[in-house]
Amino acid sequence: MSEHPQGQKHCSFCGKSQAEVGKLIAGENAYICNECVDVCLDLVQTSQQVEAGDWASRDLPKPHEIRAALDQYVIGQDLAKKTLSVAVYNHYKRLKAGQSGHVSKHEVEIAKSNILLIGPTGSGKTLLAQTLARLLDVPFAMADATTLTEAGYVGEDVENIVQKLLQKADYDVEKAQKGIIYIDEIDKITRKSENPSITRDVSGEGVQQALLKMIEGTVASIPPQGGRKHPQQEFIQIDTSNILFICGGAFAGLEKIVQQRHEKGGIGFNAEVKKKDETKKLAELFRQVEPTDLVKFGLIPEFIGRLPVIATLEELDEAALMQILTEPKNALTRQYQSLFQMENVDLVFEESALRAIAKKALERNTGARGLRSIMENVLLETMYDLPSRKDIGTVVVNEAVIRGEAEPEYKKEHTQKKDTHEHNVADLKVIDSKSA
C-alpha cells in the first residue's frame, strides 16, 4: 500500500501525497489520484481516436474496385452498381478528407449524397446495401419504413434506426457515425394524397418529416444499451451528418406516372397511337424518373431533396435468376450444397431444374427473394431424412422434382471428389439433363 511511515497516503502511480492532489481513490492495496485518472482517460480516448483514424488511413476502394466486389455477390444491375460505387466512393472520400483535416482550395463544404434505390421486389436492393457495408467494413443497420411513426405515436420512432446502428457498432459512437443505414419499403410512407388533409398522417408524410433532419444530419439522443427514454437519463449523442442513408422501395405504379408524363400532349386526332408491345419496359421508365414524378407518387419535395442520388434496378429475367442460383460467392445452390456436404452427401442440380426454379420465381413475381422458399420446399423432405440415413452419397434434383411430379433421386455413390480433410464447396456441379 502506498502509505508513508507518517501515515500519509500517496498515489501508487505518481507518488504525490494526499495533500498535493484533489482526490485520492483507494483500491485494494493501492491508491490513484484524480490527476492520474485524467491521464488514463486521455490515453484511452487517444487510443480510440487512433483506432478510428485507422479507418481514415486505409486505402479507400476505388469505384472500379467497389463495382468488382459487388459483381461477386449481385448479378446484373450494372447501372445501379456503377451509380452506387461512385456515390459511396465520394461519400467516404468526403469523410476521409474531413478526418485528415484536408481542406479544399476554396474551402468548399461537400454536402452528403444519400441514395434512393428504385426497383421491383427481389431485384437486389437490400443485398447491394449489405454488400457495400461489408466491403467497407462499416456498421450496417436496416429498418422497415412501414413500422415507423412520428415521435409520440404507437410504433417505432425514427431515432430507433440510429439506435440499431449503434448496437451494430457495439456502442462505439465514432464507428457508428461512419456507418450505413438502409431503410426498406420507403415507398410505403408516401402521403395519402397530394392535397392537404385535416387528419394527421402519422405513418406517411409525418414519417417523411421526421426522417428529414435525421437523413440530412442532426444530433440524435440515444438511450444507453437500448433502454427506454426518461427525463433523468443520460443519453448517448450521435451525429448523423456522416451516416450514409440508403432508402429503397419497389415504387409500384411509379412507372405509370412517368409514362403519363411522356405521353402528355399526345391527345387528339393527330395523336400517335401506341401498340401494347411498344410500351416502354419498367426498367426504362424507372431510369427516366424525375423528382416531379416522385412528388406525384407521394414523397414530399424536401424528402426527395435529401436523396439526390437515384439508382434504378431492373426486373430480373429467367437468365439472371439462373445466374443468381449458381454464380455469386454465396449462391443459393452453393449454400445448400454446403449443408448437404456437412452430412457427407453431394447435391447435384440438373440445368433443367435450375431453369424450372427460375420460372417458378418469375410466376410468383417475387424476384430473387422467392428462390430460397422454392428451394426449401423442394428439399424439405430430403433434409428431414438425410441426418438419419447413412446409405446416401448423392442427391440429384431434376425438373420433375421442381414441378412436384417426382422426388429427388438418391444414389449410394458420391459424384464429386472430396478432400479427406476439407470439403470444397466453391465449385457447384451442374449437369445437363440430356447428359444425365
From Swiss-Prot:
Residue sites binding Zn(2+) per the record:
11, 14, 33, 36
Task: Identify a single GO molecular function assigned to this protein.
Answer: ATP-dependent protein folding chaperone
**InterPro entries annotated for this entry?**
AAA+_ATPase, ATP-dep_Clp_protease_ClpX, ATPase_AAA_core, Clp_ATPase_C, Clp_protease_ATP-bd_su_ClpX, ClpX_bact, P-loop_NTPase, Znf_CppX_C4
User: Could you tell me the superkingdom of the organism this chain comes from?
Assistant: Bacteria
* Keywords on record: ATP-binding, Chaperone, Metal-binding, Nucleotide-binding, Zinc
Positions that bind ATP = 120-127
Name any GO cellular component annotation: HslUV protease complex
Span list, region Disordered:
407-436
The family database entries (Pfam families) matched by this protein are listed as: AAA_2, ClpB_D2-small, zf-C4_ClpX
**What are the BP-aspect GO terms?**
cell division; proteolysis involved in protein catabolic process
Where in this chain does the record put each ClpX-type ZB domain? Answer: 1-52
| Subunit (UniProt) | Component of the ClpX-ClpP complex. Forms a hexameric ring that, in the presence of ATP, binds to fourteen ClpP subunits assembled into a disk-like structure with a central cavity, resembling the structure of eukaryotic proteasomes.
Q: What does this protein do?
A: ATP-dependent specificity component of the Clp protease. It directs the protease to specific substrates. Can perform chaperone functions in the absence of ClpP.
Task: Give the record's family classification.
Answer: Belongs to the ClpX chaperone family.
The name under which this protein is listed is: ATP-dependent Clp protease ATP-binding subunit ClpX
Q: Which organism is it from?
A: Acinetobacter baylyi (strain ATCC 33305 / BD413 / ADP1)
